[in-house]
Amino acid sequence: MKGLLTAGGHGTRLRPITYTKNKHLIPIANRPMLTYAMGYMADAGIKEIGIIVNAGDDEIEKSCGSGKELGVKLTYIPQGAPLGLAHVVKIAEPFIGDDKFLFYLGDNILVGGVMKFVDEFEASGSNCHLVLSKVSDPERFGVPEISGDRIISVEEKPSNPKSDFAVTGIYLYDSSIFEAVNSIKPSARGELEISEAHQYLLDSGKSVSFSEITGWWKDTGKPSDLLEANRLVLDNLRGKNSAKVDNKSSVTGR
């Protein structure tokens, strides 16, 4: 299995921070945001990762290099313009080939990594596996309609959501996704929408399974999200102290 990671776009909602730094390199708990996703993939046994970057911008490559320090091999894939997530998948086909792959939006942070989702995708036998999270405002996201252990429809930012689940920025596919992204048409905003690709799979008789995130998940698209992501990550860090304390003393606190 390979990995595909987004690190392009312009981060307009995070200005003025992103005037001088790619949003995927903004530190969360003193680590570039993008390195969390790489670490999740490496922990799940995914060692070959393609990173979508803005054409002509080498900031991500200068920061992440070959990936050797994280135990992965990075391939940089330029995208000329932000034409939608399905377009990201489309231009990555030469890198992915016939392999299954994990597609991860680089500005997403979650607790627990992705190994559970990889295992559940492999066990499901499905063509596509979406990772969902319950939210209070599903109309802001792609929203699935669920029947049993399968998804039967997906709608992007619906006015009347059919569930209280959001499709997060974590997706798993086999090679059938490439037929979908090469067949759909641009939306009204001129982008190839990933929800349309998922619906194409469903309409073509492909199976779409899902996992639910049981801990926290954060899309760090806004300044308030960055603050919350820092708080969540720091709250889950556990320090280590190898000092010895004699048996007549006691230590309290974290």
Where are these regions (language model features)?
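A structural signal for short hydrophobic beta-strand segments in well-ordered beta-sheet cores
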Residues: 25, 144-146, 210
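Conserved beta-strand termini and adjacent loop/short-helix elements that scaffold enzyme active sites
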Residues: 77-79, 131, 211-213
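A short acidic, often aromatic-flanked loop/helix-cap motif at beta-alpha or helix-coil junctions
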Residues: 82-85, 137-138, 160, 217-218
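Short alpha-helical oligomerization interface
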Residues: 19-24
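Conserved core of the sugar-phosphate nucleotidyltransferase
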Residues: 110-188
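Active-site glycine-centered loops adjacent to acidic/histidine catalytic or metal-binding residues
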Residues: 9, 107, 134, 222
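Left-handed beta-helix
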Residues: 1, 150-153, 175-254
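Conserved N-terminal catalytic core of the sugar/cofactor nucleotidyltransferase
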Residues: 2-5, 13-16, 27, 31-105, ...
